[in-house]
Amino acid sequence: MIHFDVTKAGGAGHRSGLMRVSARLADGLRGEAMEVRWPTWDRATLRADDWFLTGELFSEEERPGFTAFLEKRAGRTAAIFHDAIPLTHPHITWPQSVARHPGYLKLLAQFDRVWAVSAASREELLGFWRWQGLAKTPPVEVLALGADFNSAPRVTLRAARARPSLLSVGILEPRKNQMFLLDVSEELWGEGLEFELHLVGRVNPHFGAPILRRIKALSRKNGGLHYHEAASDAAVTTLYATARASVVPTLAEGCGLPVLESLWMGVPCVCSDLPVLRENTAGGGCLPVALNDRAQWKAALRRVLTENTLHALLAAEATSRVLPTWAEAAETLRGALKT
């Protein structure tokens, strides 16, 4: 039996990347996994051949007794590791997350198995453990996350719109780099290029207010800018259906689900040329651009908006390339946790 941890995911009112991972894996493991929540879960039900599986963030302070639970080893334990962003980018991360992360990474070393959501995040975790000088650590494998963000079938044919539209999906915060995207878009609008920019994502309560103010100010100047704070999966699907390209100018990612999800919807993606994103962009359908290089970003967005031959090539790659699914991710876990 798999005891699947949904302590935070089960009651989350928003759809962050971490929450989406937990929700989709829970769906994929349904019938073979029992959802549990700390501390109400009766840990006495965990048998020696059972697995406790978590994709959440945790600490001893948030979950009193969790360290003792790992040390006792009443059953087997497995975890999904997302990223070390709170340590690599502390200045743009919630202070609570920054304070929690070192202890969280140390606790991961006490698990029996760990899956990282990308090769890049795997190296971050292993590097932290080496830096800590930990004598004993579990094996860490890479789990390919699903590109199918909803129940809709994969898009294999794209229709062009009369007026080009760009779509950027992600929480409003410095890490997602919407300020940079707004600056680049404003320059392109000022040069006479006509296009719509749709931003989708909740506001980070610690860092997001200045970005929201910038969106409101710029939208008053340009009717092509649209903000959707609480868009449902159905609404996002509609936005993808009318988008010429998605835009991911992010500073850091654990996996880069917005890139994968855009490709699933058949939408080419213009994104930051980060090592972690190259793991998904290398297969085609993407236009990687140097991080925060305004001239290169302006040129890339102009090209994807105006060059039909380039766009057709990227769209063909996006709709034909192999993409991972959540069913495959769940099957990977299911097969591994049966051994």
Language-model features, listed with the residues they occupy:
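Carbohydrate transferase catalytic cores enriched for Leloir-type hexosyltransferases
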Residues: 1-339
